[in-house]
Amino acid sequence: MTKLENPVLMATIGAAQGLRGEVRARAFTSDPTALGDYGHLHSMDGRIFEVLEIREAKNVVIVRFRGVNNRDAAEALNGLELYIERDNLPDDELEDDEFFYTDLEGLEAVDDKGTAYGTVSGVYDFGAGDLLELKGPGKRPVLIPFSEAAVLEIDLEGGKILIDPMAAGLIDSPDDLTGKPPKPPGKTKE
């Protein structure tokens, strides 16, 4: 059993497919059929999975793992998340303006005045576009669009992302940038 130091979620296993031990999986890679190209996949409980075969299907990939030889074994994997070590991702293949979503986690979101809006705690794709989750001390998590309008610059080395708080939906107007929390409705004094 191997514990990963810096795990990166690569796929989630779904239902069994057929009788030979294949499973349906949602891959979180740019090329879903490349899931096995990063080495062995690991579950958080320490199991290791080797991809033997992989093919595309509608919205998922069909995967056969070594040692999973029948439907019962495949059904037991339903819902399992599979990870690799961050170091297994090929940094040398990235362009200067490319990065892995996992590298965004922990970056501080600030505007052009230096106002902090929280730290990126996750990147999600619910189908209508990617979202960044920001968490701040004493604040509830918020989701902002991961778009060119909302995220103006990504500085991995500096540990920051520059955001436009209006485009991100964090404020309603530039007047909201006073640095003070908004007043509750009905309790304003002029």
Curated annotation (Swiss-Prot):
Region described as Disordered: spans on this chain: 170-190
A single GO cellular-component term on record: ribosome
Record field: compositional bias (Pro residues): 181-190
Annotated GO MF terms: ribosome binding
PRC barrel domain span: 95-177
Localization, UniProt: Cytoplasm
Pfam families in the record: PRC, RimM
Main location: cytoplasm
GO biological process: ribosomal small subunit biogenesis; rRNA processing
Keywords: Chaperone, Cytoplasm, Ribosome biogenesis, rRNA processing
UniProt remark on domains: The PRC barrel domain binds ribosomal protein uS19.
Family: Belongs to the RimM family.
Biological function: An accessory protein needed during the final step in the assembly of 30S ribosomal subunit, possibly for assembly of the head region. Essential for efficient processing of 16S rRNA. May be needed both before and after RbfA during the maturation of 16S rRNA. It has affinity for free ribosomal 30S subunits but not for 70S ribosomes.
Assembly and binders: Binds ribosomal protein uS19.
Name of the molecule in the record: Ribosome maturation factor RimM
Annotated source species: Rhizobium rhizogenes (strain K84 / ATCC BAA-868) (Agrobacterium radiobacter)
Gene for this chain: rimM
